[in-house]
Amino acid sequence: MSEKPIVRMAELEIDPDTIETYRALLIEEIEASVALEDGVLSLNAVSIKDHPNIIRILEVYADRDAYEAHLQTPHFLKYKKETSDMVTSLTLIDVDPIAMRSKP
């Protein structure tokens, strides 16, 4: 494993007609990823107030290997396949963390 954590922000726009189904699939994928993958340190999804179809996901992986492994998991591949027609826009942004803290 490499040493540097991978942190990225995913910015998505979802077809408003599919938002409830999309959210259910996103929750399922996040819960599986955090529970089953040691290298997935954190996945946090939020929507923009008054624009529930605009989603932001802060993703934190232990390292590049963990991120690459995540992309090949059955639960992630299922999520990508089942949501592909729901996502109207996707931007992935690599970010440098400044301060990230949480309580257990």
Where in this protein do the model-derived segments appear?
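Glycine-rich beta-strand-turn "strand-cap" elements at beta-sheet edges
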Residues: 1-6, 44-53, 80-104
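N-terminal first-folded block
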Residues: 2, 6-36, 41, 45
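Short, well-ordered beta-strand segments in beta-rich or mixed alpha/beta enzyme
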Residues: 5-13, 42-71, 93
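An amphipathic, aromatic/His-enriched active-site/gating alpha helix that lines ligand/cofactor pockets
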Residues: 28-41, 60-93
